[in-house]
């Protein structure tokens, strides 16, 4: 089941970018329209994704946002920032490649949300696990969206993590980009770890074999190019058991000139029909139910395969033939281990040398900036051997490890000859936090562009223009 985030048409409050959720107030004004909305919701919730019941899409995030509005917190800078952070996580996610593992820090004194965008092929099941390390109990809103080509919808919510299990999984029915959004309650934070991986959605159909036994693939030419191969051929010795890849119903058992002895199974959950051909024996009868792993026949070379070594022709059909490879082929890929120093997580650091900043942690990353030695930055996440950094101007990116150090110890001390104002950020919109009188010391901790970051004799930190 999936939930269309079309607030304009379903809930009457405009697209996701609109300001101020009116979901519950809208419903209270018109109970009749609420009933119509509910019916329309279930009609629109077509089975485009397979989501286990504990992970069905929920409106917990929107309900929490409504509670902020009821408390008039949406009129405060803090409440507005929470909503904007959730939207930014969808509209400006980090592009990643699966499998992926990251440890990140969300400061409870700040308002944050994170988003990850990744591409998923049909036939795979995506498994997402979250871990929370926080001194306080908190709710982490974990929602999964599919990017939509419809500008009115923009995103389609397909799954939500169960709060107790902090786990989420789903099976797409189309090749598409998906976005995972993670956002805690207001004034809650800590260290988090997220693991996103992909696995085949059904079992391998030949006992004791794996994808290395597939020697002929979907789309390969047949009959001198007159037709295409609508399945995969899995080679094994004669009489090797053929297994039901999932719970299913036996719909047909028979014999034909091309497929030889065959069996058809119907997986109602996934709306697919599975075809097993060239069988030596058939061990099931039409109308019966089978469970995943049950023997339904044995490998042979009947039909037009009599001149080839024994093998199973396995096909999947859903409104036509589809490539079964990703449904059954093991991924055998683990995310790279996190080797960065977790002591840096959530801390201000400075560069030990000139550093190239890349736009993403994946193999297709591109350089987007270069920062000079002693530049100040904040470490917000660790993944493999990379650090995700936030620069003082709000830009972000990824840098390689072993190029940073804590920005605690002074690089040098300066005695100021003139009065200087210290600002909270290095920019024209900065706010003055304190003043330094002539003759006072200023410990230089780092810099960023035309500003110096440091600490006063009283221990106040901030930015001053380059001297």
Where are these regions (language model features)?
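Non-catalytic extracellular/lumenal accessory regions of secreted precursors
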Residues: 47-114, 197-223, 228-230, 350-353
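C-terminal motif of bacterial Sec signal peptides marking the signal peptidase cleavage site
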Residues: 42-45
